[in-house]
Amino acid sequence: MEGMCVKFDVIGLDSPCVDLAVNVRCFPKPNGAERIQNLSWQGGGKVASGMVAAARLGLCCGIMGNVGDDKYGTFCLRDFQDHGIDTEQMCVRKNRTTNFDIVISDEGSMGRSFVFYPGNAECMTEEELNIEYISNSSYFYMANLDSV
């Protein structure tokens, strides 16, 4: 792959998601409504977000994991690539969906709440893990063992 690192600083393992992040002044009461102040589409997931942050700081990063072959999976892969993260080891599951979250933050409490749709793209199997790829990194970052 052109531009790939000889050795990675960090490789992550994750089942990334797409976040629709919305900000409201306050949460509406039941059956109420509140105007959205701001919204954005973002790649998400603990490890995925960490990889993007590390890449923005100049580290050489790679990501392993799974997405569906839907528009959200395409979004995740493009977002990693736009940040210079190697996606060679990502598994794209045919006829499967990628995790999706709506992240609601409100100015009143300064908190965040999540509403999520778990995609059905299966996690990587042990057989799909490329140990040579992982060993070509100074650090390996994963959030939980459910990723495999």
Where are these regions (language model features)?
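Flexible domain-boundary/linker segments
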Residues: 27-30, 71, 97, 119, ...
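Short, basic and Ser/Thr-rich N-terminal targeting/leader segments
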Residues: 57, 96-99
